[in-house]
């Protein structure tokens, strides 16, 4: 995919999920930091059957933090305690020969040990960490709600910092601290922002096979942001080196997402 970085973009229509829906979740207070990397470097992490997705001649690596809220099984209610936690992940961008776009997770840090153990058992690279959300400025009365009111709340409030602090367990374990200040109320709708966030599934290696786990959600309400603080060791720990500040910095109050039935990817289809 190529395009004019400054041109407006159209958010793709969210896909219909193959039944059954196996999880309903809310991803809130999301911070997206992205750096360019070479397609060749990204290719070394791709599972069989998919290749790196490219925008403006580059692959991209992302550091993304958010609050998981009310995650539940099927269409049921959120699971108490286990369904709400902080997550910070490092991800790449993938594409199948048929055009299906997704993400490939290099790591996903979470602060709920049972969640980490359960997801690692099926091949998703979760890591148990201590994660704290960076709070708003002292005295801020911001209260971000679920649904459409999230966008309205963000659009009428003063700028506030939001970010995450990650400490993996162990004296020499990787750490990350990042905070951004959203530029409100102007929405970010450029092609790169859409390319990095309009992702409706993940590619991964599960039990010896490549599979795609689909999800669907409405368009992220996106805002550009300025880096307030950044000290990251998670990307390096995943095996990728980046230099300088991130080229894309975004904030979103959040979306509701649902996950559907996985499907296998034909490993011989790449070329």
Language-model features, listed with the residues they occupy:
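Hydrophobic, proline/glycine-rich low-complexity stretches
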Residues: 1-74, 218-223, 227, 234-235, ...
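Short, surface-exposed, charge-dense and proline/glycine-enriched linear segments
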Residues: 6-11, 79-91, 134-139
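Internal, well-folded beta-alpha domain core
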Residues: 30-31, 89-271
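Short, surface-exposed linear patches
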Residues: 53-57, 75-76, 85, 114-116, ...
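Extended, compositionally biased
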Residues: 60-110
């Amino acid at each position: 995919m190529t395009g004019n970085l400054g041109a407006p973009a159209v958010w793709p229509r969210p896909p219909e999920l193959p039944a059954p829906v196996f999880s309903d979740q809310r991803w809130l207070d999301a911070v997206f930091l992205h750096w360019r990397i070479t397609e060749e470097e990204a290719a070394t992490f791709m599972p069989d059957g998919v290749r790196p997705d490219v925008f403006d001649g580059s692959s991209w690596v992302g550091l993304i933090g958010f609050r998981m809220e009310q995650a539940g099984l099927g269409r049921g209610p959120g699971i108490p305690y286990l369904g709400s936690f902080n997550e910070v992940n490092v991800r790449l961008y993938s594409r199948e020969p048929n055009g299906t776009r997704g993400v490939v997770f290099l790591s996903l840090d979470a602060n709920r040990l049972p969640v980490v153990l359960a997801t690692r058992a099926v091949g998703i690279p979760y890591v148990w960490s201590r994660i704290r959300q960076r709070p708003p400025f002292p005295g801020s009365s911001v209260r971000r709600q679920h649904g459409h009111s999230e966008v309205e709340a963000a659009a009428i409030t003063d700028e506030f910092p939001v970010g995450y602090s990650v400490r993996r367990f162990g004296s020499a374990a990787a750490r990350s601290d990042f905070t951004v200040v959203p530029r409100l109320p102007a929405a970010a709708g450029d092609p790169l922002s859409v390319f990095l966030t309009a992702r409706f599934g993940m590619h991964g290696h599960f039990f010896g096979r490549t599979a795609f786990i689909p999800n669907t959600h409405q368009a992220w309400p996106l805002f550009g942001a300025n880096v307030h603080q950044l000290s990251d060791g998670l990307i390096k720990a995943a095996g990728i080196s980046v230099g300088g500040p991130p080229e894309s910095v975004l904030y979103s109050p959040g979306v509701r997402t649902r996950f559907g039935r996985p499907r296998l990817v034909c490993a011989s289809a790449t070329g």
